[in-house]
Amino acid sequence: MAKFVTIGERLSTTAPAVNKAFSERDPEPILKRAKQQLDAGATYLDVNIGPAENDGPELMKWAVELLQGNFDNVPLALDTSNVAAIEAGISVYNRAKGKPIVNSADASGRLEYVDLAAANDAIVIALCNGEGIAKDNDERMMYMQTLMERGMEHGMDVAEDMWFDPLFLVIK
């Protein structure tokens, strides 16, 4: 891995203002938050549109084009449980400054996200969990191995294109 990467995580529908802006296709709040994160040193911006069951593909395309069009093709992490929306975002993504990130795969219900990243020459964030958070490091390693093997089956460069998140819990 060549460098430390900072991913800005403030473009998420979990924030009421962002949810409203995405729903209404209001660019100003989104652009303002994006600029704040980039000014603070973010390398990538995470675009979390939530499940977006009704209009996910259109919304993700709109968000990708908005952000890359206003911020010189800023690299993005596409974050949603809607696979069609991630595919749509990748279809309009400009790779001039970096590959898209598929956020995120796990060793259970989202293993297909590794396949999606591999098929689109994208990076994948791979959460070292399955049905829940791993109870110990051995379980984390088991999940990581499952994800890594899946990526290798598709010819992914595991060192460059699979970013593992061990999901460590806070120690009290």
Language model features with spans:
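Active-site-adjacent beta->alpha loops and helix N-cap segments on the catalytic face
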Residues: E53-A63, T80-A88, Y93, D106-A118, ...
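Glycine-rich, proline-tolerant flexible connector loops at the mouths of alpha/beta enzymes
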Residues: L38-V74, F168-K172
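N-terminal small/glycine-rich loop or linker at the start of catalytic domains
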Residues: M1-D26, D121-I133
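Conserved anion-binding
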Residues: A107-K172
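Conserved, mostly hydrophobic/aromatic
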Residues: Q37, G89, F164
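Alpha-helix-loop-beta-strand connector modules within alpha/beta enzyme cores
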Residues: M1-A2, E9, D55-K97, E149
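Catalytic beta/alpha-barrel core
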Residues: D46-E53, V74-N82, K99-G109, C128
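Structural preference for beta-strand elements that scaffold enzyme active sites
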Residues: A2-T6, T43-D46, N73-A77, K99-I101, ...
